[in-house]
Amino acid sequence: MSKQVAHSFSSEDFSFIKQKLAREAVALVEPGMRVGLGSGSTAREFILALGERVRNERLAITAVASSRISHLLAQALGIPFLDPALSQELDLVVDGADEVDANLRMIKGGGGALFREKILLQSGKRNIILVDERKLVSVLGTFPLPIEISPFGCSSVEKVLNQQGYIGDWRKTSHGERFITDNGNYIYDVSSPDSYPHPEEDLIRLLQIRGIIDVGFVIAKAEVWVGYADGTVVRKEIT
C-alpha cells in the first residue's frame, strides 16, 4: 500500500499522529511482557499510554528504557523496571526514528540515545518503529547522521572521519557545551555526505574507526508503522 506524503502539517497533526500510533502499539502489550522503551517524542507518547494501562488496568509488565529521560518518565508513571544488565531478551521494543527509507533502513539518534536504543532493538523479539509520514525518505541522509564517539582521542577520530569524507559538527547543548550521552560520550553529527544509498557499507566503514562507539544507521529487522495526517496507519515490514 502506498500513500502520498502530505505537504502541510500543523503541530496538532503531529501530536494526533503520534498519539494514535502510540495507542495502537500499546494495545499489543500483554501481562508479563518485558518491554523496551525507546527515546524521543513518539516513544514518549507510547510511554504515556503504557503508564495509563499500568495504572488503570494494573497491567503487570516490566520495562527497560533506552535513555535517562525515558526512564524517569516511565518511573514517574509507575512502570516497573528490569535490571538492564540482566535483561537478555525483550518481548516488545517500541521506538521512533529520524528517517526511514524504502527498504526500512533508518537513521536514529537525534536524541542522543542511539547506542542504548540499538541494544534494545538487538534484544527485542518484536521491534516496532513508530514514525509519521515526514520521516519517510527515498535515500537516507536528509537528517544528519549521529555518531557516538569516546571523549578519549575524539579530535583524532574527527580527523579520520574528515579524511574519509564524513564532515560534521560536535553536538552542543543549549548552553553551548558539548552534548554528553547517558554513556558519557560525545555525538558528532555528520552533515556531509547528505545521501547514503548504501548505508550498510558506510556502517561497516565507520565502525572500523577506533573511538567510534556506534553509528546512527539501523539496519535490522523491524516493523515500521507510519502514521498519516488523514488518521490512517500503514504497517510496513521487510519479509
Swiss-Prot record:
Q: What's in the keyword line of the UniProt record?
A: Isomerase
**MF GO annotations:** ribose-5-phosphate isomerase activity
Q: Name one Pfam family in it.
A: Rib_5-P_isom_A
Isomerase found in the keyword field: yes
What top-level branch of life does the organism fall under? Bacteria
This protein's pathway: Carbohydrate degradation; pentose phosphate pathway; D-ribose 5-phosphate from D-ribulose 5-phosphate (non-oxidative stage): step 1/1
**Quick one: which residues bind substrate?**
39-42, 95-98, 108-111, 135
GO biological process annotation, one example: pentose-phosphate shunt, non-oxidative branch
| List of catalytic residues | 117
The cellular component terms of Gene Ontology attached to this UniProt record, alphabetical and capped at eight, are:
cytosol
Q: Which reaction does it catalyse?
A: aldehydo-D-ribose 5-phosphate = D-ribulose 5-phosphate
EC number, as in UniProt: 5.3.1.6
Could you confirm whether the keyword Glycoprotein appears in this record?
no
Q: Which NCBIfam families does the record associate with it?
A: PRK00702.1, rpiA
Q: Which family does it belong to?
A: Belongs to the ribose 5-phosphate isomerase family.
Primary role? Catalyzes the reversible conversion of ribose-5-phosphate to ribulose 5-phosphate.
Subunit organization: Homodimer.
Record's protein name: Ribose-5-phosphate isomerase A
Name the gene: rpiA
